[in-house]
């Protein structure tokens, strides 16, 4: 997933 919130793990 590119540009998805699911890849937003900070």
Swiss-Prot record:
Its keywords, alphabetically, are:
Blood coagulation cascade activating toxin, Disulfide bond, Fibrinogenolytic toxin, Hemostasis impairing toxin, Hydrolase, Protease, Secreted, Serine protease, Toxin
GO molecular function annotations of the record: serine-type peptidase activity; toxin activity
- The yes or no answer to whether the keyword ATP-binding is present is no
Question: What regulation of activity is recorded for this protein?
Answer: Strongly inhibited by PMSF. Not inhibited by EDTA, aprotinin, pepstatin, leupeptin, and bestatin.
As recorded in UniProt, its EC number(s) are: 3.4.21.-
One further remark on this entry is: Negative results: does not induce myotoxicity or hemorrhage, when injected intramuscularly. Is not lethal when administered either intravenously or intraperitoneally into mice (maximum dose tested is 20 ug).
Q: What is this protein called?
A: Thrombin-like enzyme Cdc SI
Origin organism is: Crotalus durissus cumanensis
